[in-house]
Amino acid sequence: MLRRSLLPIAICAAVAGAGVASAQTGESLSSSWAQVNICNASQLGARAQLAGDGSSSQMSVRFTLQWLSPSGWVPVTGAATSPWQSAGSAEYTWGQAGWTYNLTLPPGHAYQLRAVAELSWSGENARTATHTTGTCTAGG
């Protein structure tokens, strides 16, 4: 009975060890993404995940809130771009950070909104990437 219950634990430990080894060789174990996690008439929240690569690089992200105007996607007026947010060290498999915008929308009007996330890894493996969230409709 004891032997049967230890087998799944041994398999899990072997898989976990393989994941750590891959992260240390610089292979990305998870993907980077950005998404809207709050969408209503008074707030839009955006969140991003940055994939770690096992290095000592620092990961950070900033967001720019956009609305769909008649001429295409443009930044909202006011403070459209957030400050840089720390997502932690790339030593780990992934890091996340987010930003919440407070909205003031005219009553009776609905707007299509999205956020553009600028992802940054600094240090020995410096690089950047851009991800765009899905859209949401706020107001109405």
What label would you give each PLM region?
Residues L2-P8, C12, G19-G140:
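Low-complexity, Ser/Thr/Pro-rich intrinsically disordered linker/stalk segments at domain junctions
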